[in-house]
Amino acid sequence: IPERQKELLYAIASAGKAEKIMSAGFIRKYSLVSSSAVQAAARKLMELDLLTEEDNIYFIPDILFRMYLQRLKNTNIIFIPS
């Protein structure tokens, strides 16, 4: 998964459920690059079924994957080297 997509997954996993992911506030809070990068990453992640959007709320539908991302982001453990 490309870095921009990983960053968005980490951000949404941290939030649990995220609204307005392309807003300046969300982008700043999670140190994302730009709204266009977030939009492109979200589109691709939804194509891969790694991200779901319902009523303008984005979330990771697989709870185990979401928990894995939360733990990975919060502990700085690298399970699979890049």
Task: Show where each model-derived region lies.
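Accessory beta->alpha helical hairpin/"wing" motif in late/C-terminal subdomains of nucleic-acid enzymes
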Residues: 55-67
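A short, conserved structural fragment
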Residues: 46-56
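Short amphipathic alpha-helical interaction segments
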Residues: 30-47
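Short, amphipathic alpha-helical interaction segments positioned at domain boundaries
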Residues: 64-82
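Small/polar glycine-rich anion-binding or flexible loop at a beta-alpha turn
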Residues: 26-29, 44, 58-60
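Winged-helix-like regulatory helical subdomains adjacent to P-loop NTPase cores
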Residues: 1-35
